[in-house]
Each structure stands twice: as C-alpha cells, then as structure tokens.
C-alpha cells in the first residue's frame, strides 16, 4: 500500500475526545486531525512524537486531515489508523503474500453471519473447499518486543470469537488474523493483563478449531505491506 499523495509530517501536541488530535506542522501551523482509532492507543500518542497524516480531497469533511502513523521518539513506526488493518490484509491475500490463506478465488467483505448477527471482515470461497471466515484485529500495543491485543476490554472482540467458534463448529474454516502494525513488535500474545476474558476465549477458540494467525506489516511514511509471520503465544 503506497501513500499517495505522500503523507505530511507534524508533531503531536495531544490526543483528546478519542477521535481528535492537535499537531503542529514544521511551519508552526496548528492543525486538528481526525484520529480513526477507538482504542486506548497506549504508547502511540505521546506528546512530542512525530505524526504522519493524510489529507482528504473531500471538502465537506470537518476534519480533512487523518492521523495515519506515529513515529516514536525511539524510532518505531506505528499505524494508528485501524481501518488500514483490513486494507493491508485484503491486499496481502489478493497478492498471495499470506500462504495460509492462499487457494481461494473469491473474496467478499463485510458478510453477515453468526447467531449474534455479526459481520465478518472477509469471506474467502473456492470450489470444493469450505468457506473461510476471517476476522482481522489491529495490534499496536507494545511492551518491549511483545505485542498485545486488545489494549482495552473488548466485548465486541469477545463476541467475534464466539461467532468464529460457531463457524468452525458448522464445518467452515474460521480464522482470526492479528495484523501487527508496530515496527518494534516481534511476537504476539493476547493481552491477558488487560482483558482476561478475551485471552481465555482466544485459547478456547483455538482448541475448537479457530485458526490464530499473526502477521507483521512493514511500515514507513511511504508505504505499508503486511507479509511477515509473527510467533504467537496464547
């Protein structure tokens, strides 16, 4: 995924009201960015960090600038735009960069499924193969080289795991993909210290046939690409 037009650089002043952030540009202008991330963003929103933002051509948007990346004072890149996780995963599947998800010729997005009336991020289909249901989660919480999900208690994430267990029980393929969007992370675990219920459900889901995958994105201010498998400890 190439950023076109190129991202612009600024310095973070503060994130507030969850969806907004004030930054100062190199010429001294203060801007308010849209922050497309509902999570705690622990370690991703430290005042003084470098922010990379995109600008929409939609003149009707109240906040035309979107916070895409954080470049920390320690040199790590973090993609804070959670919408990018799905885009990167879709691109990687279509370009056959995720071997575990190859061999399908149909990809559908936002398909309704499950007893709890959810929407799956992706469904893959092919002749003579079970349908493959894929839920994607964005991983940005880092403690040293360890990556964790979630960064706050997530009842929605718990629901998705229950739905995937139902998919597996029905004879379909069920997969959760953790898209690691932090350049310093080298391994992944569920955040048992934050949401014990989610961690327990993830282990239960794996035991009941749900596949748990983690891939790391190559990140820069110019492009992003999801391709590197990450070791998982449940």
Swiss-Prot record:
Organism: Salmonella agona (strain SL483)
Superkingdom of origin: Bacteria
Protein's job: Binds to DNA non-specifically. Could be a regulatory factor involved in maltose metabolism.
MF-aspect GO terms: DNA binding
DNA-binding region: 201-220
Entry keyword annotation includes DNA-binding: yes
Entry keywords, A to Z: DNA-binding
This protein's name: Sugar fermentation stimulation protein A
Similarity annotation: Belongs to the SfsA family.
Lineage per the UniProt record: Bacteria, Pseudomonadati, Pseudomonadota, Gammaproteobacteria, Enterobacterales
């Amino acid at each position: 995924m190439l950023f076109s037009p190129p991202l612009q650089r600024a310095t973070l002043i503060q994130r507030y009201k969850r969806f907004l952030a004030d930054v100062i540009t190199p010429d001294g202008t203060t801007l308010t960015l849209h922050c497309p991330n509902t999570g705690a963003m622990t370690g991703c929103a430290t005042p003084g960090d470098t922010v990379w933002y995109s600008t929409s051509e939609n003149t009707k948007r109240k906040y035309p600038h979107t916070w895409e990346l954080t470049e920390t004072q320690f040199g790590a890149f973090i993609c804070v735009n959670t919408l990018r996780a799905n885009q990167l995963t879709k691109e990687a599947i279509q370009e056959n960069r995720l071997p575990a998800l190859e061999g399908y010729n149909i990809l559908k997005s936002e398909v309704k499924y499950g007893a709890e009336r959810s929407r799956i991020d992706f469904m893959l289909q092919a002749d003579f193969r079970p349908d493959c249901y894929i839920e994607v989660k964005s991983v940005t919480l880092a403690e040293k080289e360890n990556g964790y999900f979630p960064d706050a208690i997530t009842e929605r994430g718990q629901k998705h795991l229950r739905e995937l267990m139902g998919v597996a029980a029905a004879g379909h393929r069920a997969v959760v993909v953790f898209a690691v969007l932090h350049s310093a992370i080298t391994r992944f675990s569920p955040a048992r210290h934050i949401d014990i219920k989610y961690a327990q459900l993830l282990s239960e889901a794996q035991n009941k046939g749900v596949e748990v995958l983690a891939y790391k994105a190559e990140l820069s201010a110019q492009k992003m690409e999801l391709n590197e498998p990450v070791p998982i400890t449940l």
